[in-house]
Curated annotation (Swiss-Prot):
Originating species: Cereibacter sphaeroides (strain ATCC 17025 / ATH 2.4.3)
Gene Ontology process terms (BP): translation
Summary of the function given for this chain in its UniProt record: Forms part of the ribosomal stalk, playing a central role in the interaction of the ribosome with GTP-bound translation factors.
PANTHER family for the chain: 39S RIBOSOMAL PROTEIN L10, MITOCHONDRIAL (PTHR11560)
Classification via SUPFAM superfamilies: Ribosomal protein L10-like (SSF160369)
Name this polypeptide is given: Large ribosomal subunit protein uL10
Length: 171
């Protein structure tokens, strides 16, 4: 790889570190190509990506970034999983690590916060953006449906009372 290619890789990695909601770093020694392709496919499904890069170039790309201390995690055979959604990459990486013992999560970064393996696990346990939106919508919708039910209930009660009175008069 010549100098121009290295500079291009450093620039690409810098953009990844700036634009990603979360970056998860893991060791992948012993993971087969097929298993790595499976991980890449799972990441693509959630809008994330997986990148293997030279640790030295990644550390250069991290220089001056809020997540610069993540460079301490970049030793050995490392892979970076990242996504704009702050939870998606962590969820996929954590689930994949549970299935594959050779994929070991070292930590990661979420903005300027450096995560240890337990931190990545905590982030993975959080609901995704879509799940949070669904929860908020259901919370907002619940009172509205209760109000609609309360408004409709007296009318049905009055109708029931009137039908009972009619039955009594007819009898």
């Amino acid at each position: 790889m010549d100098r121009a290619q290295k500079e291009k890789v450093v620039e690409e990695l810098g953009q990844i570190f700036e634009s990603s909601g979360v970056v998860v770093v893991a060791h992948y020694a012993g993971v087969t190509v097929a298993q790595m392709q499976e991980l890449r496919a799972q990441m693509r499904d959630v809008g994330g990506s997986v990148r293997v890069a030279k640790n030295r170039l990644a550390k250069i790309a991290l220089a001056g970034k809020p997540s610069e201390k993540m460079g301490d995690l970049l030793t050995g055979m490392t892979v970076m999983a990242y996504s704009e959604d702050p939870v998606a990459a962590a969820k996929v990486a954590e689930a994949y690590a549970k299935k594959n013992d050779k994929f070991v999560i070292l930590g990661g970064a979420m903005g300027d916060t450096i995560l240890d393996p337990a931190g990545v696990k905590t982030v993975a346990a959080m609901p995704s953006r879509e799940e949070l939106i669904a929860q908020i919508v259901s919370c907002i919708g619940a009172p509205a449906s209760s109000i609609a039910g309360a408004i409709g209930a007296p009318a049905s009660n009055i109708a029931g009372i009137l039908s009972t009175l009619e039955e009594r008069e007819a009898a």
